[in-house]
Amino acid sequence: MDKTRQTELVRWLKQHSTSAKRWLRISMLLGVVSGLLIIAQAWFLAVILQALIMEHTPREQLLTPFILLLAVFVLRALLTVIRERVGFRCGQVVRQEVRNMVLNKLQALGPVWVKGKPAGSWATIVLEQIEDMQEYYSRYLPQMYLAGIIPIMILIAIFPFNWAAALILFATAPLIPIFMALVGLGAADANRRNFVALGRLSGSFLDRLRGLDTLRLFFREKAEVQQIRESTEDFRSRTMEVLRMAFLSSGVLEFFASISIAIVAVYFGFSYLGELNFGSYGLPVTMFAGFLALILSPEFFQPLRDLGTYYHAKAQAVGAAESLVTLLESDGEQKTETGDKTPQDKPIQIEANKLEIYSHDGQRLVGPLDFTIEPQQRIAVFGQSGAGKSSLLNLLLGFLPYKGSIKINGDELKELCPDKWRALIGWVGQNPHLPEQTLIENICLGKPTASEAEIQQAIDDAYVSEFLPMLPDGLNTRLGDYAARLSVGQAQRVAVARTLLKPSRILLLDEPAASLDAHSEKRVMHTLNQLAQQQTTIMVTHLLEETVNYDQIWVMANGQIIQRGHYAQLSQSEGPFARLLAHRSEEL
C-alpha cells in the first residue's frame, strides 16, 4: 500500500468520525479531567511523603490530604469506567453507520454483483473488518489528542519546582513517537495482507463446508483439505507478522520510557547527594519536588505508550478500510442507472428496442433484443445454460445495466425508482431463500400486515398446509439456518406462499420447479400457473408440458431470441423448440 493510498484511507476514517463527534469530544474531555486527577494524585502523595519523611508531621494532621487522595483514586476509577463506555459508544455509532453504508451498497449493486465473491469473504467484510475499526474510534482518535495534552499538563505541573526534570522529560518525549512511526511503517500494509488472507480463508472454508457432500462423492476431500491447510498457514504467517510488529513497537516504547524515567531518577539521586546543584532555581532540591517528578514521570509517558498501543488499532483500521472503500466506490465499468419516477400501478406492458444487457464489468450478456409483452401476457423462456435467460430476469429486477431501451408502461426502466418498481414484482427463483427465523415471518416477508384469513388462503393455495401439521410449532416453527428444517420442495412452497400473499403486477419465475421431486413440482407449478393467469408473467423453465397454455414461448441462445411463438405453432414447425420437444419425447 503506497503512502498516498494510506493517507486517503486515514482521511476517509476521520471523515466518518463526524457522526460520533459528540462522543469523541466527551471522551477527550474525560481524558483531560483524568489527566488533572493524575496530577492531583501525585501532588497529594508528594505532600504526604514530604510531611511524613522530611517534616515528621503527625499523621493526624494529614487526614485531609489522605481523604483527598482517596477521593482522587475513586474519581479516577469512575472516570475510567465512564470513558470506556463513552469510547465504546463512539466506535459503535461509526460502525453502525459504516455497516449500513456497506449493506446499502450491496443492495444497490444487487445479487448478481455480490455473487462474484464467496459468501465467506462478504461475511469477513461486513462483520470482522468493520468490527476491527472499533478501537480506532474508541481509543486511538481520543488518545491522539490526549498524547499531546496530558504530557504538556504534567510538564506545567513539574516545571515550577524543577526545570531540569521537566527538561529531561521534554527532551526524551519526541523519541517515542519517532521510533514508534519507524517501527510501525509497514503495520497498515501487514494488516491489509492479513485481512486479505482471512477473507480468502473464510470464503474457501465456507464454500467447501456447504459443498461437503459433493466433494466426498467425487473423492476430493484430501485435495480440498490441503488447500484449506495452505490458506490457514498463509493466514497464520500473516497474523504472526502483525503480532511481531506489535511486540516490537511495544518494546521500543517501553525501552525509551524506562530510559527517560531512569535519567530523572539518577538526576534526583545525585542532587540529593550534593553532586548536582541545578534545576531548582538556586534552591535546594526538595523531597516534594523529587517525589512529584518521579511519580509523574511514568504518567508523562503513559499517554504516549497508550498511543503506541493504539497505533496498531489505526493500522488495523486502515487495513480494514481499504476493502471497505474499494467496495463503496465500486460501480463496475457499467453502472446500473436508477431514477425516482413512480411506476404506473396498472397491468404491466413491457417494450424493448435494441436492448443490450451488460454485466457490471462491461461484458455484453444479452442482445440486441426487440420484443413487446402485452398486459397479462404469459411468456415462457427456454434455452441452454448461458443463453441469457436469467440475465433478462435480473435486468427486469434492476440488478444489471443495459443499453438501448426497455419501457414499462411507456416509462424507461432506468428512470423508475427501483424500490417502488420491485414492490410491483412477484418473484420465485430456483433456490428459495428464507431469511427470517420462523415460518410465519418468511411467509409475511413481503406483507407483514397480512390478516389471518389472507395468510391461511396463501398457505392453502401453496399447499404449505400439507406439511404444516408435521412441524412442531406450526407457523411459529423456527426453520434454522438455510431453512434446514424444511426440504427443498417445502421451502419452495413457502416461497410461493410468500409470493401469493404479496400483491404484484408482474410475476418473474426462474426455474421454480428445479431440484423438486415430482409431488412438489406438481403442487408448485399448479399454484404458479393459476397465479400467472392474473398478471404479466415471464417464466424461465425446462418443463415443456407446463407451457402449453402460455401466450408465447421464447427460445434463447447466445443472448438472442432465436425463435418465438405459441406452443402449437412451434411444436409443428422446424426449429430448436421442436428438436427439444422431440429429444424430450425420446427420453420419456
Swiss-Prot record:
Somehow involved in the cytochrome D branch of aerobic respiration. Seems to be a component of a transport system. GO terms for cellular component: plasma membrane. It comes from Providencia stuartii. CDD domains: ABC_6TM_AarD_CydD (cd18584). The chain crosses the membrane at residues 29-49, 62-82, 149-169, 170-190, 250-270, 276-296. Residues 24-316 form the ABC transmembrane type-1 domain. It is found in: Cell inner membrane. Belongs to the ABC transporter superfamily. Keywords: ATP-binding, Cell inner membrane, Cell membrane, Membrane, Nucleotide-binding, Transmembrane, Transmembrane helix, Transport. This is Transport ATP-binding protein AarD. The keyword Cell inner membrane applies. GO terms for molecular function: ABC-type transporter activity; ATP binding; ATP hydrolysis activity; ATPase-coupled lipid transmembrane transporter activity. InterPro entries: AAA+_ATPase, ABC1_TM_dom, ABC1_TM_sf, ABC_transporter-like_ATP-bd, ABC_transporter-like_CS, ABC_transptr_CydD, P-loop_NTPase, Type_1_exporter. PROSITE patterns: ABC_TM1F, ABC_TRANSPORTER_1, ABC_TRANSPORTER_2. It is a multi-pass membrane protein. It comes from the Bacteria. The keyword Endoplasmic reticulum does not apply. Residues 350-583 form the ABC transporter domain. ATP binds at G383, Q384, S385, G386, A387, G388, K389, S390. GO terms for biological process: cysteine transport.
